[in-house]
Structure formats: structure tokens, C-alpha cells
């Protein structure tokens, strides 16, 4: 398929630069199969969830992954931690006038010292000195890495608003943004209705913002991210399917974790590992029936994912409606509910 099939015109004013004033107050476009588009608010989500349905959340937590400093040679440097390997070692994207050489010392804010000890592709392996762990150093001295389309520096408000209320495990460099709309009160309402909540972990990497640079999407190489599906979640999903209930993925990262864990057999299995799953039109979904997601960038892999899930024509119509009604787009923007289109050619 051609990348131009996933392009659309988006007025710049619709790109949300700040979160809504109150968490959970965003708009919700309900775009389920076989029903007209509905303009709602996010607090109406329980209206579409049945007792016994399972909602699967990604419990990853965004690290303060951006560090500023200088090389021992004096040049300025910026590091974005992509993955923590152990208590003192991490892989990082490096921005500098010249790439650091193996063995070069780096000094970051707060007196953090690190040494480059190798490379893995475009990533540099950094070994941090001192007794504190990488996570502790980042929490004390790092900066929250907002997406590139948010054209401002992170502030104190982002420290809480760019995290979900259920975030547990550090490791992401970008938030699972569909989850940003959920409040504790809404989670209680869903449970009171009889919905089941379950969790996966997928540490969102910087590759989520990587543009597709090829004309034919089949030639695109997807980035890899670490994920885990606990046994309790696999059991909850299988039980829901057995009784005829729906499985909801809260966000594309939850969907990618679930579908990755079902790749081998077509049934969800507990486990962990790295995934580079690339979901495009023609993909056969094994787990997810409903998807809560934000609005995605033109020509992005996530727009391809939702097009695979609900059908390209359906997504085009929904996005055209969203632009006309001036929904807010991307990480701090509004949300939509999508259903799996069983009529999609697979």
C-alpha cells in the first residue's frame, strides 16, 4: 500500500499543545460499526461498555528521560534514554555536534557522570557512575520528554498530566495517551457497571514518533518495544471471550501488547519480550474487539493500525468529521471509540 493512502489535511490549530483544564473532560467521538458517528464527552464511555467486558490498560510510566549536559571535551550534548538495561546502564539517543566516541565521559545536570561503552544501531550505550540507579538519577535530574509536535518545554503540570493515574512501572519515553483521559472516578464507574479491568505493560519508545520514510508501507521497519502480558490478564481476556463479552484495548500500545502475545497461536498467552508488530490493513485481529484511542498523525503507523482495525473508509470519514468539528488531535487531544470491523478485507 502507498503511504499517501494515509494522508489527510490537519489544521495546525487542532494540535493540542496543553492537556484539557480538567482530566477526563475531553470530547469523545464514538465511531462504532453500523451506527452513525456520535459526538460525546469522555465521561460517557461507560454507556458503551457492557457488564463483563474487559478493559485492558497499559500501566507503563513515563521516565524523565531527557538529560542535558556536555562531553568531557566541552561540547554540549542531549541524551534521551530509550531503554534502561540494568541499574547503571541504559541505551540512549544522543544529540551533539559530533557523536561521542567509545570511552568518552559525559557530565549531565546534577553532576551525573556517564561513559559511552558501545552502540546498538543508532543508540548509544551509557554506563552511569555512582551508587544511584538510572531511574533514581532520571527522577532527580531528568526532564519529561514531550512529543515533538508539542512546541513548548515541559512544565510542572506535565509531570502529572503526561502520566496516567494508574501508571506503575517506569520505562516509557512517551505516554500511552488514550489512558490520560481516565480518572479514578471513571474507573470506579466502569467497575460499578460490572466491567473488568486488566493491565499489560508496554514501554513506549521514541520510535513511536518515527516517521514512515518509504512510499510503500510494506518496506517500513518498525521499532521494537518491551512488553508483558501477565497471566491474570490473559485469563481475564479468555474468560470474557468464553462468555461472549468484548475485549477493549485502552490505547494502541495495549492493543499492540495483546496482539503480539497472540501472534504465535491466535490465542492470548501470558508472556514478555520485545515486539516490533506492525499492524496494517489486512492484519487479522485475534484479541481486541474495541479500541479507545486518540487521533493520530497523518501517514503514521498508528493511523495505519486504526485503519486496519475499523476499515480505511470508516477512519477517513471519522477523521474528516473530527476535523470539521474541531476535535483536538494527538497526545493531549480528544479521544475516539472504535470497533473491529468484521467486514474489513483481511
From Swiss-Prot:
Catalytic function, reaction form: 7-aminomethyl-7-carbaguanosine(34) in tRNA + S-adenosyl-L-methionine = epoxyqueuosine(34) in tRNA + adenine + L-methionine + 2 H(+)
One cellular component (GO) term of this entry: cytoplasm
NCBIfam families documented for this protein: PRK00147.1, queA
UniProt key word ATP-binding: no
Single GO biological process annotation from the record: queuosine biosynthetic process
The family this protein is said to belong to: Belongs to the QueA family.
Entry's localization field: Cytoplasm
Keyword Cytoplasm: yes
Protein origin, superkingdom: Bacteria
Species name: Neisseria meningitidis serogroup B (strain ATCC BAA-335 / MC58)
Protein name: S-adenosylmethionine:tRNA ribosyltransferase-isomerase
Molecular function terms, GO-annotated: S-adenosylmethionine:tRNA ribosyltransferase-isomerase activity
Function: Transfers and isomerizes the ribose moiety from AdoMet to the 7-aminomethyl group of 7-deazaguanine (preQ1-tRNA) to give epoxyqueuosine (oQ-tRNA).
InterPro entries: QueA, QueA_dom1, QueA_dom2, QueA_sf
Subunit architecture: Monomer.
Alphabetically ordered keywords of this record: Cytoplasm, Queuosine biosynthesis, S-adenosyl-L-methionine, Transferase
Pathway: tRNA modification; tRNA-queuosine biosynthesis
EC number in record: 2.4.99.17
Any one Pfam family match given in the protein's UniProt record, by short name: Queuosine_synth
Main location (coarse class): cytoplasm
The encoding gene: queA
